Amino acid sequence: MTVMAPVVTVDGPSGAGKGTLCKALAEALQWNLLDSGAIYRVLALAALHHHVDISSEDALVPLASHLDVRFVAEGGQLKVILEGEDVSHEIRTEAVGNTASQAAAFPRVREALLRRQRAFREAPGLIADGRDMGTVVFPDAPVKIFLDASAEERAQRRMLQLQGKGFNVNFERLLSEIKERDERDRNRPVAPLVPAADALVLDSTEMTIDEVIARALAYAREILA
């Protein structure tokens, strides 16, 4: 019988701190890392690199099925490696974002990427960061964490992040955008953003990131022991 590599899933809304937590867990456990939110952007960039017709589902499916991508947590940073090249910054451009949205609209592309995400499950284990990792992608994961925080706290964190990059931001507008996205994510008909029934729900509103990491790591080690 094949023993599947263990998976720790971390789901939650935008701005809850999933990325930071997952990088820390991957480094602490020395496990593989999957950033599911970046995978559509990686596909979009690969399509642009290979001059694949982004409006053709038939052309995108084989590319999605054989996407050569790795995620590497290094010194608290996430590196996205596409076909051996670091594309961490390139995937964040507006052109790639727009292309990613188009690709995500195709059901067969989503199905191909679902299989591709499951292929990240390799020894010694996988940390999976997303919105439906514990409910759809890895429903049998032994450790499931749902990381949440109030919309106000997430807007505050995002504002500080953007200000740190030199952007002028309006808190009320940010808060409104986050609430709208939450509403959309929680009420969508396919894979809504909800905690898995067996997930540990962590509310990080009043916690420091170090406290979140310590709590999640202790929980994971307890289950995996």
Swiss-Prot record:
Catalytic reaction equation(s):
CMP + ATP = CDP + ADP; dCMP + ATP = dCDP + ADP
Listed A to Z, the keywords are: ATP-binding, Cytoplasm, Kinase, Nucleotide-binding, Transferase
Compartment list: Cytoplasm
**Gene Ontology annotations for the cellular component aspect, listed alphabetically:** cytosol
Q: What is its main location?
A: cytoplasm
Q: Where does ATP bind?
A: 12-20
- GO function term, MF aspect, one: CMP kinase activity
Q: Which residues form a coiled coil?
A: none
Q: Which domain of life is it from?
A: Bacteria
Listed GO biological process terms: nucleobase-containing small molecule interconversion; pyrimidine nucleotide metabolic process
Q: Which Pfam families match?
A: Cytidylate_kin (PF02224)
Q: What is its EC number?
A: 2.7.4.25
Regarding protein family, the annotation reads: Belongs to the cytidylate kinase family. Type 1 subfamily.
What is this protein called in UniProt?
Cytidylate kinase
What species is given as this protein's source?
Pectobacterium carotovorum subsp. carotovorum (strain PC1)
